[in-house]
Amino acid sequence: MAALCKYPQQPLLHNPQGYGQHHGWTSKRGIFFSEQPLYRALGQSLGLAPGCRHPLVYIMEAADDISYCIADLEDAVDRRILTQGELLAALRGADEGDYMATLLEEALASERGFFPHFRQHLTRDLVALAAHTYVSDHEAILSGAYPRALLHGQAPAAQVLDTLKQVAREQVFMRPEVEALELEGYAALRGVLSTYACLLALPAAQFERLLAGNGGSELFFARRLFHRLSARHLKAYRLAVASRDPRFDYGAEQEWYYRVRLLLDYVSGMTDTYALEEFRLLSGI
């Protein structure tokens, strides 16, 4: 469980100005306020200091970097967002020295095809680099306080990795057809969240009526939205508000916080396709 938490920093409730004062992964927050007791207990059982990563997180992060940076460009070529010629021109123009030139030359000459060879050889070198960094900085990584990713520095393979990310940002993700998909997704999420927000506007007593299966004509629309919520998330909400949490000054504050979490967890658990279908349903499209 600790290895799944990429950003173990907790929210800055009393010092919002603290955001941006750190760099790298320490500047991001990955633990909800409600999850703090669980992560604290997890850290105590594993010997992790507050805000420190589990060592396996660094390996998982490196694996993500290796797989996605290559897959994004390969997928862009397969979908004809970018031609192989355009990709090669961008990579050659990066001027990463002999390592890049040799990697491209051998991949183009390979009988298996460009991407299989490119992916295999770059992955091999990146895995070796990650392993070397992990061993070299073993003590800092085991402490959970290592501030960087494993794949950093001036090593040729790391420089190529950075170049692949830059090419993806500038020549794939900024293409009109890709941005159109992002706008469609943004509109869908915004529409779903805006519609379900009416459940947050309800007084606690009215939301309790929905939980009890009651509600008059004034809750006509809210009741139908409520019926679409996941039973699993509703169960988690009921458990969270069943007993008083001393971290909240008021019971109403606790209830509303977990109602927000209920909707947030429900929406964030949607697949892209489901979120779009939900948006169309709620919009009458």
Where are these regions (language model features)?
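Secondary-structure capping and boundary motifs in well-ordered enzyme cores
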Residues: 51-59, 115-119, 123, 152-160, ...
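C-terminal amphipathic alpha-helical interaction region
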Residues: 213-281, 285
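Zn2+-dependent metallopeptidase catalytic domains
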Residues: 132, 207-208, 279-283
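Sequence-structural signature of the catalytic-core scaffold of metal-dependent phosphohydrolases
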Residues: 1-114, 127
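Hard-cation-handling environments
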Residues: 99-152, 170
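Divalent metal-coordination and catalytic microenvironments
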Residues: 64, 189, 267
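Short, charged/polar, low-complexity loop and linker segments
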Residues: 42-47, 167-172, 246-254
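Substrate-recognition/cap regions that form aromatic- and gly/pro-loop-enriched pockets
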Residues: 139-240
